[in-house]
UniProtKB/Swiss-Prot annotation:
This is Probable inorganic phosphate transporter 1-7. SUPFAM superfamilies: MFS general substrate transporter (SSF103473). InterPro entries: MFS_dom, MFS_sugar_transport-like, MFS_trans_sf, Phos_permease. Its main location: membrane. Keywords: Membrane, Phosphate transport, Phosphoprotein, Symport, Transmembrane, Transmembrane helix, Transport.
Length: 535
């Protein structure tokens, strides 16, 4: 890479934080807001789907989704997300970030609406169409991971880059929060308009016909924030790093950045390509330079998501233990949606959202490595603290302590590896592979999410087949599952050692794209500082 290319990039690295940086955070962050809303809102309505479509006359308890149907409805979006992360990650490097960025939103908008319009003459066909549209919804969501992270990293200055990328990711917390609040509003409105007896009083009447609209409305509203952001995304210029380093047009890169950032960049003639940086993805040279880095980002994200998505194992027990969700038969269908949404909203407000924003505040102060290592460490400690004396926590008088431990575990997931595993892959790989490698890392994480959400759902079943949930085979029990999760977090600490610290360093320094041009880089940096000071 030549000095004239470095000129525009160094100007971005030293540019002061300005309004367009925050605009980019909002534009990219609204995608993640939508992602979180769409992925998490399904958990608010699965109980309702069971009552509506799988009611059994004469049963003591309301209908529930069979294990295979529940796994499909909850997990199919993860499968789509994994595929979308790989495909759009690759496409973002092939065609450019800007060209692909709007596609993901359109897929999300169309499939959010279509999910709420799922149709069929019997439960099987309704669930099939719902799963079909949620797969493609996940496909669009998956594309947002590598593209949003890459775009934000390539726009940001090196001083606050970590906070900017983490802020985009932190919008997930608000998406979860909004999903819960909206479900509370919708269910409260329907309960007021269409009151119904509890299940134990009148099983059939406890689910009013209008309840079928509740889950559809909640799913469809996910299209709104994505649709509102589409125009803004279409107006974002291509990132300077893609234009200069991949498209090899430093002049256009300088022109594009001068339009949106208050930085004076002299448009110089096109530089020559550095042959030492022309190796391909997964080539011998790539593996030599970045092989361990990619192993580090994929393994830590995989291990983190196993633990993070295993929270489904304990939520229902925790909510019931502290009285947030009473037994299902003591509520009607819409009341159950209200109680579940209220519980999830409180968890998001007290644990999830603060953890995200602690990362935003401290990531450029103490660094990515320290936050990730600290997060895995405390997750390990709290998982073992829950597991080893598990029988102690099952006593009613000790359950508040269990809830506190549980909340701290996921606070340190968010003020820890859940955020840093998203940030780091967008910083340490060359520009021409950045989106692809982030997509690979994210897809590895989503594979871990499937293991955590569904593998452990089976694994955590009681070894005594008479005590397993309906339709599930015997497992190893919750205590042993917690021990396994503690070991998973411990492995996360080990693999974090493969991930380099990127705090305060330029993307080109981290990726090695300027290692042959130290002198020209230094010269260009001086020029850039002069340009910025006059801007």
């Amino acid at each position: 890479m030549a000095g004239d290319q470095l000129n525009v990039l160094n100007a971005l690295d030293v540019a002061k934080t300005q309004w367009y940086h925050f605009t980019a955070i909002i534009i990219a962050g609204m995608g993640f807001f939508t992602d979180a809303y769409d992925l998490f809102c399904i958990s608010l309505v699965t109980k309702l789907l069971g009552r509506i479509y799988y009611h059994v006359d004469g049963s003591e308890k309301p209908g529930t989704l069979p294990p295979n149907v529940s796994a499909a409805v909850n997990g199919v979006a993860f499968c789509g997300t994994l595929a979308g992360q790989l495909f759009f990650g690759w496409l973002g490097d092939k065609l450019g970030r800007k060209k692909v960025y709007g596609m993901t939103l359109m897929v999300m908008v169309l499939c959010s609406i279509a999910s709420g319009l799922s149709f069929g003459s019997n439960p099987k066909t309704v669930m099939t169409t719902l799963c079909f549209f949620r797969f493609w919804l996940g496909f669009g969501i998956g594309g947002d991971y590598p593209l949003s992270a890459t775009i934000m990293s390539e726009y940001a200055n090196k001083k606050t880059r970590g906070a900017f990328i983490a802020a985009v990711f932190a919008m997930q917390g608000f998406g979860i929060l909004t999903g819960g609040i909206f479900a509370i509003i919708v269910s409260a409105a329907f309960e007021a308009k269409f009151p119904a007896p509890t299940y134990q009083i009148d099983a059939l009447a406890s689910t009013v016909p209008q309840a079928d609209y509740v889950w559809r409305i909640i799913l469809m509203v996910g299209a709104l924030p994505a649709a509102m952001t589409y125009y803004s995304r279409s107006k974002m210029p291509e990132t300077a790093r893609y234009t200069a380093l991949v498209a090899k047009d430093a002049k256009l890169a300088a022109s594009n950045m001068s339009k949106v950032l208050q930085v004076e960049i002299e448009a110089e003639q096109q530089g020559t390509e550095d042959k030492s940086n022309s190796f391909g993805l997964f080539s011998k040279e790539f593996m030599k330079r970045h092989g361990l880095h990619l192993l580090g980002t994929t393994s830590t994200w995989f291990l983190l998501d196993i633990a993070f998505y295993s929270q489904n194992l304990f939520q229902k027990d925790i909510f019931s233990a502290i009285g947030w969700i009473p037994p299902a038969q003591t509520m009607n269908a819409i009341q159950e949606v209200f109680k579940i949404a209220r519980a999830q909203t409180l968890i998001a407000l007290c644990s999830t959202v603060p953890g995200y924003w602690f990362t935003v505040a401290f990531i450029d102060v103490i660094g990515r490595f320290a936050i990730q290592m600290m997060g895995f460490f405390f997750m390990t400690v709290f998982m073992f603290a829950l597991a080893i004396p598990y029988d102690h926590w099952t006593h009613k008088e000790n359950r508040i302590g269990f809830v506190a431990m549980y909340s701290l575990t996921f606070f340190f997931a968010n003020f820890g590896p859940n955020a840093t595993t998203f940030v780091v892959p967008a910083e340490i790989f060359p520009a021409r592979f950045r989106s692809t490698c982030h997509g690979i890392s994210a897809a590895s994480g989503k594979l871990g999410a499937m293991v955590g959400a569904f593998g452990f759902l089976y694994l955590a079943q009681s070894p005594d087949k008479t005590k397993t949930e309906h339709g599930y085979p015997p497992g190893i029990g919750v205590k042993n599952s917690l021990i396994v999760l503690g070991v998973v977090n411990l492995l996360g600490m080990v693999f974090t050692l493969l991930v380099p610290e990127s705090k305060g360093k330029s993307l080109e320094e981290m990726s090695g794209e300027n290692e042959q041009n130290d002198e020209s880089s230094s010269s260009s940096n001086n020029n850039s500082n002069n340009a910025v000071s006059t801007a």
